[in-house]
């Protein structure tokens, strides 16, 4: 594809009736959006074909002209997809580039296509169609990643690992339970994209510049042709609304945040200090000077790249926050933010899916880490409540005292003798040691949503079924 220049006179042909001179070159550079909005070509052509068909059905356009327009637009589509379409900066945007080429192909009927339409409602429908398609793509990408996490959860339903708070060992959990935590996050992400898609599925085409049109158009016809549930109900809102883009960016930002959190965990877990996971060679790189290195570059790059999605959301909120109704040229700055966020998110989902599918948990390191750091202290406190009828606060104090003694001895809680424990509370019995093992600890967490292996297996099976059984 090329971005060919165009003369000022040609540039004015679309809107220049009241202008005596063409735009300054710098103005043209500021004004042109074809460098990025050419990505909307398929949606623009689809919207124009639906509009032409409706105009013909309403008797506003002859069937002969409508047929010529429809065939001409398909030719333009083929030219763009073949890679040889001469995009021209002077024609400003994708709408004018398509229309100008259509005029070259079919002549005078091309000028009738814009009847009862403005670029304001044209770009609104193009952009909505594109974002709607991206919601579908995001949902598909999220589901693939969910399946990868479910497969890990299914395999490691009873692999014990430490659960953390403040990045310090807190309580034993299972590998599968940790994997399913991300499935839950991603399920909410999927729901947010689905909700956003449902809300944006109204068609602004036919709102014209801002006030509607006096032509007897059928907005329900174009809405149905483009797969929308209904036409938008207020022409002012139709052309000034970018909530659909903001919602897409908001959902993308939260999803990116979730991906970034797991990327951070992969960086930590794959380090020599943790050795919780082995990352595939496909997702790591080496060092040019240190032969022993295997760097988690994919995870690190995602951790950084995904910040762009959050930045894009803030940028578009900033653009929109001070705009009066209806359309302002500021709104041309909406697309680059959405395009970049969508590209980054889709790359992140694909890369993370590959890393999760390929990673191997180091069960020995996980189990050893789970058994350290007094991870079953809460189990001891619970035992004191259940078996000795201590108030939990008293049990907490007794357990804390025992932890301090073990720490002073340089050992863990199971390494204390019964006599040492009875010095702190004489009611402690031999059977207390059963609750201090990490395997028993996770098996005991049978409350709904808890980390017990049977719970994990049940949840993994549930998600596998919900996701189509392909996990």
From Swiss-Prot:
Pathway given for this chain reads:
Amino-acid biosynthesis; L-arginine biosynthesis; L-arginine from L-ornithine and carbamoyl phosphate: step 3/3
Query: Record's Gene Ontology CC terms?
Result: cytosol
Q: Give the matching Pfam families.
A: ASL_C2, Lyase_1
InterPro entries to which the protein is assigned, alphabetical: Arg_succ_lyase_C (IPR029419), Argininosuccinate_lyase (IPR009049), Fumarase/histidase_N (IPR024083), Fumarate_lyase_CS (IPR020557), Fumarate_lyase_fam (IPR000362), Fumarate_lyase_N (IPR022761), L-Aspartase-like (IPR008948)
Q: Which UniProt keywords apply?
A: Amino-acid biosynthesis, Arginine biosynthesis, Cytoplasm, Lyase
Q: Which terms does the UniProt entry file under GO BP?
A: arginine biosynthetic process via ornithine; L-arginine biosynthetic process
User: What Enzyme Commission number(s) appear in the record?
Assistant: 4.3.2.1
| MF terms (GO), sorted A to Z | argininosuccinate lyase activity
* Reactions that this protein is recorded to catalyse: 2-(N(omega)-L-arginino)succinate = fumarate + L-arginine
- Per its UniProt record, what PROSITE patterns does this chain match? FUMARATE_LYASES
Could you tell me where this protein is found in the cell? Cytoplasm
Family membership? Belongs to the lyase 1 family. Argininosuccinate lyase subfamily.
NCBIfam families, per database record: argH (TIGR00838)
Protein name, please? Answer: Argininosuccinate lyase
């Amino acid at each position: 594809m090329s971005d060919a220049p165009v003369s000022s006179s040609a540039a004015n042909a679309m809107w220049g009736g009241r202008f005596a001179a063409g735009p300054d070159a710098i103005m043209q550079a500021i004004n042109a959006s074809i460098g990025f909005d050419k990505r909307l070509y398929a949606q623009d052509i689809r919207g124009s074909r639906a509009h032409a068909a409706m105009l013909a059905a309403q008797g506003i356009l002859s069937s002969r002209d409508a047929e010529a327009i429809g065939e001409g637009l398909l030719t333009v589509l083929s030219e763009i997809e073949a890679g040889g379409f001469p995009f021209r900066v002077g024609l400003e945007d994708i709408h004018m580039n398509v229309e100008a080429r259509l005029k070259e192909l079919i002549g005078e009927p091309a000028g009738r296509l814009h009847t009862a339409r403005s670029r304001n409602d044209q770009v609104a429908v193009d952009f909505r169609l594109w974002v709607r398609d991206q919601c579908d793509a995001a949902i598909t990408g999220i589901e693939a990643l969910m399946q990868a996490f479910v497969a890990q959860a299914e395999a490691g339903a009873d692999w014990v690992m430490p659960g953390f708070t403040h990045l310090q060992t807190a309580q034993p959990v299972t590998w599968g339970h940790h994997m399913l935590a991300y499935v839950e996050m991603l399920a909410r992400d999927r729901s947010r994209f689905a909700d956003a898609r449902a809300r944006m599925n109204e068609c602004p085409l036919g709102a014209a510049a801002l006030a509607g049109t006096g032509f007897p158009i059928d907005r329900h016809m174009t809405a149905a042709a483009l797969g929308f549930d209904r036409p938008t109900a207020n022409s002012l809102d139709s052309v000034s609304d970018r909530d659909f883009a903001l919602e897409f960016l908001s959902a993308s930002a939260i999803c990116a945040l979730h991906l970034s959190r797991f990327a951070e965990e992969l960086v930590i877990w794959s380090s020599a200090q943790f050795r919780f996971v082995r990352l595939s060679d496909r997702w790591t790189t080496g060092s040019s000077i240190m032969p022993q290195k295997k760097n988690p570059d994919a995870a690190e790059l995602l951790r950084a790249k995904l910040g762009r999605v959050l930045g894009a959301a803030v940028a578009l909120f900033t653009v929109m926050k001070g705009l009066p109704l209806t359309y302002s040229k500021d709104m041309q700055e909406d697309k680059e933010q959405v395009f970049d966020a969508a590209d980054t998110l889709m790359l992140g989902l694909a890369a993370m899916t590959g890393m999760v599918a390929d990673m191997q948990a180091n069960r020995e390191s996980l189990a050893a880490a789970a058994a350290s750091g007094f991870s079953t202290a809460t189990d001891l406190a619970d035992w004191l409540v259940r078996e000795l009828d201590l108030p939990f606060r008293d049990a907490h104090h007794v357990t804390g005292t025992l932890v301090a003694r073990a720490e002073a001895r340089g050992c863990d809680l199971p390494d204390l003798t019964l006599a040492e424990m009875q010095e702190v509370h004489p009611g402690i019995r031999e059977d207390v040691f059963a609750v201090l093992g990490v395997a028993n600890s996770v098996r005991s967490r049978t409350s709904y949503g808890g980390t017990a292996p049977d719970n994990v297996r049940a949840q993994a099976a549930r998600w596998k079924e919900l996701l189509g059984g392909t996990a």
